[in-house]
Amino acid sequence: TDAVVEATAQTIPGYTYQPLFDENGMKTVASGTVAGDGSLVLNLYYTPDADALAYHANGGQGTMAATEGVTDQVVEVAANGFERAGYAFVGWNTAADGSGQAYAAGAGYALTAGDDALFAQWTANDGTAYTVNHYKVNAAHTAATLDNAENLNATTDASVSATPQTIPGYTYQPLFDENGM
């Protein structure tokens, strides 16, 4: 008893020790004299560090501002601000490949000490337009005239193959590569 003791601040990821904290009835008491009745209580206060939730386009285009907050604060997940041609945005995920925790816009996200990031998740659109042009090449192989253009649809990034058409008096040449044609 009657010994003076001093508490040692711990390292808590995402928090900073406040040796002079004195707010709302909370006050840091880092040292004191040990009373015989065991009534000494030392209180050390740590405040949360600034933190932010970053958003990644994950194949999309554009930029989005991070959602600002502090460690352990629940922040609202932002609506998507990215674009990706031929794709529809389907939500956010903590992993780029979609294997992590999924989040929707407006959902709560608890900031953690360290990096907090969400990755846009996309699904390929069905019905993405593409065109197949069928050309007739002149006898000298120096010019070509468009005979027919097919406007077709497929899933974005799907591998497609053109089907040759029958053009009377012409033979399809699958490996034709002359004079820039």
Predicted stretch roles:
Residues 1-181:
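Secondary-structure capping and domain/repeat boundary segments
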